[in-house]
């Protein structure tokens, strides 16, 4: 890869205020503030050199009168942790000042040689890009390289919309999916070397069974994150209409054939933009963006409201959760094991049977 560093224009690391407001959430991973940023989608997540790293979209709110030049888009904030519970902010190095374009959604991956990299959509470029970590703290990155697939005749495809890319390796081949607009299907590319990409067509298999899955094939698939879980493939994604959801199925003949579809949102679509990683002991752990909602209508706070004047957060990262499959292939979701260290003053009752239409009072629990 191009070893030119892009981290030399970094701004200082964000920091929590010494005395945060009473309504400021500090239990979840929340961007420091208040009133300084609009944090959003979680993005590249890694376990690397003994630490977990997570990036997320971070758009600093600058009053219009203080803006200098055009708005080139958001940065990616960067945090790391030894346990995915207690986080440290790093300097913000991935953004317009260093990459030449804003950082929209993407994902992290490891090359076949074990080197960490990122693939993402560069705001304003209508293209996806790849960059590689140059140091163990992930504070220095290579100059971004263009991802431009070719058709069967070897001609570059320049008129295709690209956004929200995800990348994985299967049988020694790199595959990358590009999300597209709500009226278009996600498309697949493949490469042997991360430089030369072939366009493969639609990701979803033509045998996609809408009746069985309970969802239309053309339902928006954005923020995809695809990985193997047990002997099945899982596609986490969102619909801008439905919120966070998932498919379970098989990746066969270089297409994805789902067998199950499930929702991760119910009353509201405030659980958004999933991202996951593998832990050091092989667990699949995911995050999502918890968008701000109004209690009355369960809808995101309208952007036209005076967000700059709000003294509350406009989004936090969900608590991390572990994903696994049951023996009969059902997706199981449970809180991250490491969160147990936050528990105090445990009360326990065991071998308890509660019959229907009865009340059992737990002693010492309020």
Label the model's feature ranges:
Residues 4-216, 221-222, 228-268, 281, ...:
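Beta-rich carbohydrate-recognition and catalytic domains
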Residues 268-278:
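Catalytic and ligand-binding motifs that coordinate phosphates/metal ions
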Residues 354-366:
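Secretory/extracellular carbohydrate-interaction modules
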